[in-house]
């Protein structure tokens, strides 16, 4: 079977259209844009695009680019980026890309198929960088503008991870690194619209790439990223010091909008699901009845109302994003909803010693909504005899501990993809689980289940939509019946932005990209749409 798709969305390229109001014609004197992408008192100097933390939330898309861009707010939309088209062969085990001509790295070297082949071979040889667990067999340049990547298994379903989630790095620089997995890349060279111009622990800046392959883009000449803690950011937003932020704001009308809705805007599209993660290497949390009792005790409606200020909704028990994911939900669970049942929870825990029901709930201190949610969860679980100590830690510490399995309970989000499968795979695929002490790139609860992995493999082995939906429905049943994670609420893509300097921001009417500055590569797509506001 051979399938070819020439991606014909040239008009959807990020630089070719914009929305949001009138704009000026010349950006030579355009002002810098001040951005807050992640809560941090200090920054760590690490621009390896495969290190999923710190400054790389958002900025990797500005420096390093992928072969294609997938708009999660418009399922099915695939936009040519560093590649113009792709072609499957060998029953989904080989994928050939035709690359965009005339692209250069920011050091002036040409971008070629050798760079793409090197990147995928690097992912094959260094499991720590292969965050999507791609089963790469080999990659080779067929011509300066053509590259083929071969896989050990049918990989139709992984196109998003392959083409949209694998930033391409320059071979001529990265091949000199003995261990690219530990390479911090303090002088990044990419193909993207920006390049790093200044870095300190309190502020880093990025300036426009004058040789970027989209002519005349970007129109924002300079990006500034000051370090703000969550509390400091609230003050900065009130005082107009930040132009674009991605944060939970307790009272957004008072703190940010301030009676100027045309100037101070926000857009919170659903981005995935936030769950309570039980570390399943803990023998007590590995017991299904304990997880079921926890789920029955938690008042999710109150969490959404109090901790999330009503900005989102309680998640469906399958974890499937709703509305929009109905076809991927098992028919028998279409109308399922979480209900609090303290009596039943207590009944389920009768065979468990109270001494065993003591856990620490780890949360990132800067995420004030999650901190508040953790307190509510603690109170709810206490009603059924489960003792929980909530512990807030620095963002980087939380990323490290959850990734390495050094926790008992935690709260974490799972990002959505072109279909619910990608979120479910991230949450449940056994191939992403690592031994405690090794950093995982998903499945942080370390769920290992043969049926789960079989369903994930069935989805990946076909390009038949009905079969893919059937496999995802099976994963939904596992979520409802086995509770490997406890879905809480849908994760909004937090985004606050001002139109005083630039217009063209994403909106509900024009959702051309996720609006959050911490989302890669969407943040770069947003910047490529912006135009100076008319004064």
Regions found by a protein language model. Name each.
Residues 495-535:
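Long beta-strand-rich cores associated with HINT superfamily self-processing modules
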Residues 338, 389-397, 427-499, 534-535:
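Extracytoplasmic/peripheral linker and loop segments enriched in polar/acidic and small residues
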Residues 211-255, 387-389:
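Ligand-site clamp/hinge motif
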Residues 256, 281, 285-325, 373, ...:
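Periplasmic-binding protein-like
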Residues 34, 87, 98, 131-175:
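Surface-exposed binding/hinge segments that line
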């Amino acid at each position: 079977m051979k399938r070819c798709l020439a991606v014909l969305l040239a008009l959807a390229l990020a630089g070719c259209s914009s929305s949001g109001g009138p704009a000026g014609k010349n950006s030579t004197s355009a002002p810098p844009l001040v951005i807050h992408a992640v809560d941090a008192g200090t920054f760590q100097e690490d621009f390896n695009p495969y290190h999923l933390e710190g400054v790389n939330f958002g900025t990797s898309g500005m420096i390093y680019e992928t072969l294609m861009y997938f708009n999660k707010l418009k399922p099915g939309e695939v936009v040519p980026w560093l590649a113009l088209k792709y072609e499957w062969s060998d029953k989904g085990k080989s994928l050939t890309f035709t690359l965009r001509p005339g692209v250069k790295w920011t050091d002036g070297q040409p971008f070629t198929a050798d760079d793409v082949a090197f990147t995928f071979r690097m992912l094959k040889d260094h499991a720590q960088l292969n965050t999507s667990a791609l089963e790469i067999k080999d990659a080779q340049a067929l011509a300066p503008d053509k590259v083929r990547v071969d896989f050990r298994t049918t990989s139709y379903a992984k196109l998003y991870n392959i083409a949209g989630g694998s930033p391409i790095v320059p071979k001529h620089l990265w091949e000199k690194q003995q261990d690219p997995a530990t390479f911090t890349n303090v002088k990044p060279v990419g193909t993207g619209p920006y390049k790093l111009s200044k870095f300190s622990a309190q502020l880093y800046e990025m300036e426009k790439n004058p040789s970027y392959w989209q002519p005349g883009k970007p129109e924002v000449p300079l990006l500034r990223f000051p370090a703000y803690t969550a509390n400091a950011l609230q003050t900065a937003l009130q005082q107009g010091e930040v132009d674009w932020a991605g944060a939970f704001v307790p009272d957004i009308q008072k703190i940010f909008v301030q009676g100027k809705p045309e100037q101070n805007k926000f857009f919170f599209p659903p981005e995935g699901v936030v769950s309570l993660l039980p570390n399943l290497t803990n023998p007590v949390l590995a017991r299904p009845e304990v997880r079921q009792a926890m789920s029955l005790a938690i008042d999710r409606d109150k969490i959404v109302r109090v901790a999330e200020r009503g900005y989102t909704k309680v998640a469906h028990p399958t974890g499937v994003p709703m509305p929009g994911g109905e076809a991927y939900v098992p028919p028998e669970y279409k109308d399922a909803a979480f209900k609090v049942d303290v009596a039943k929870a207590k009944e389920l825990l009768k065979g468990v010693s109270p001494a065993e029901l003591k856990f620490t709930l780890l949360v990132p201190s800067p995420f004030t909504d999650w901190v508040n949610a953790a307190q509510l969860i603690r109170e709810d679980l206490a009603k059924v005899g489960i003792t929980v100590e909530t512990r807030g830690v620095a963002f980087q510490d939380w990323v490290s501990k959850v990734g390495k399995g050094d926790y008992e309970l935690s709260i974490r989000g799972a990002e959505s993809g072109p279909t619910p499968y990608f979120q479910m795979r991230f949450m449940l695929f056994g191939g992403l689980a690592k031994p405690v002490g090794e950093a995982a790139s998903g499945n942080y609860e370390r769920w290992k289940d043969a049926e789960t992995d079989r369903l994930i493999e069935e989805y990946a082995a076909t390009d038949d939509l009905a079969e893919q939906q059937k496999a995802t429905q099976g994963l939904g049943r596992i979520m409802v019946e086995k509770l490997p994670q406890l879905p809480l609420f849908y994760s909004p893509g937090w985004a606050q932005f001002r139109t005083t300097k630039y217009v063209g921001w994403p909106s509900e009417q024009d959702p051309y990209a996720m609006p959050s500055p911490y989302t890669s590569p969407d943040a770069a797509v947003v910047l490529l749409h912006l135009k100076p506001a008319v004064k």
